[in-house]
Amino acid sequence: MPELPEVETVARSLAPQLLSRTIVGLAKLDWPRMLTPPPPEFAALVAGRRIEAVGRRAKWLLLTLDAGWTLAIHLRMSGHLLVAEPAAADAPHVHFALDLDDGRRLIFDDQRKFGRVHLLDSTGLLALDAAHGPEPLTDDFTPAVLAERLRNRQAPIKALLLDQRLIAGIGNIYANEALWLAGIHPLTPGGTLTVDQIAALHHAIRLVLADAIANQGSSLRNYRDGYGRRGNYQEHFNVYDRVGKPCPRCQTAIERIVVAQRSTFFCPLCQVLVQ
């Protein structure tokens, strides 16, 4: 699933293609369940709306429209967005497309049909924002904020990092990578981290996410940016999906366990679980 770096990369690549464009109308929809509100209402509300900003909140891509509306798009497992010529919408896994006033289309290709497109008013946007924790790359996300988020929590730190209500945008890939960089075992109860460990984890989260954005995200399967380009960060993984391979720090074989129903990779020497 695209995480913060991938969605941020998509937003940055779509912005120059979409800013100031007007949505002419709904061009294609063959999977109505992906839309909120229902298709007839959705189509009527987006027609003629001007795209004023392209941004991100957590793992949601946000297209700010005039008249107080926002298109909130979640790519889920296999979705990707492109601005392309109209014929591109005929591809077999394109389930949603919007006509733009420059003759092109914003198309949503989603092989597994898990993606979602929500048209939100100001109240809906506030609710989406409130459902997520702080953005980890903002100045407001400090070690003290991280410590407060983890206070008294006995769940494994890996599971807590995946909880979007606590911290926004971190998914399985970057939780694994940040914990390795910080030298913290993924099963460590979040509320037991020391001040030094919290500082190390805070630094690691920000560094890993920033590096991933600089490399246009990670392309393991379907992920592409708004121009159809693959990311490169998968070439820089230290532990993710590297079971049995040597740890870049100490050469110990990387191990795999399951935490919060997700594959979890760590170095048993660099990331010791303190009982």
Swiss-Prot record:
GO terms for molecular function: 8-oxo-7,8-dihydroguanine DNA N-glycosylase activity; class I DNA-(apurinic or apyrimidinic site) endonuclease activity; damaged DNA binding; zinc ion binding. GO terms for biological process: base-excision repair. InterPro entries: DNA_glyclase/AP_lyase_DNA-bd, Formamido-pyr_DNA_Glyclase, FPG_cat, MutM-like_N-ter, Ribosomal_uS13-like_H2TH, Znf_DNA_glyclase/AP_lyase, Znf_FPG/IleRS. The keyword Lyase applies. Keywords: DNA damage, DNA repair, DNA-binding, Glycosidase, Hydrolase, Lyase, Metal-binding, Multifunctional enzyme, Zinc, Zinc-finger. It catalyses: Hydrolysis of DNA containing ring-opened 7-methylguanine residues, releasing 2,6-diamino-4-hydroxy-5-(N-methyl)formamidopyrimidine; 2'-deoxyribonucleotide-(2'-deoxyribose 5'-phosphate)-2'-deoxyribonucleotide-DNA = a 3'-end 2'-deoxyribonucleotide-(2,3-dehydro-2,3-deoxyribose 5'-phosphate)-DNA + a 5'-end 5'-phospho-2'-deoxyribonucleoside-DNA + H(+). Its EC number is 3.2.2.23, 4.2.99.18. PROSITE patterns: FPG_CAT, ZF_FPG_2. Gene3D superfamilies: 1.10.8.50, MutM-like, N-terminal (3.20.190.10). The keyword Zinc-finger applies. The active site is at P2, E3, K59, R262. Its cofactor is Zn(2+). Binds 1 zinc ion per subunit. DNA binds at H93, R112, R153. A zinc finger (FPG-type) spans 238-272. NCBIfam families: fpg, PRK01103.1. Involved in base excision repair of DNA damaged by oxidation or by mutagenic agents. Acts as a DNA glycosylase that recognizes and removes damaged bases. Has a preference for oxidized purines, such as 7,8-dihydro-8-oxoguanine (8-oxoG). Has AP (apurinic/apyrimidinic) lyase activity and introduces nicks in the DNA strand. Cleaves the DNA backbone by beta-delta elimination to generate a single-strand break at the site of the removed base with both 3'- and 5'-phosphates. Belongs to the FPG family. Monomer. PANTHER family: FORMAMIDOPYRIMIDINE-DNA GLYCOSYLASE (PTHR22993:SF9). HAMAP family: Fapy_DNA_glycosyl. This is Formamidopyrimidine-DNA glycosylase.
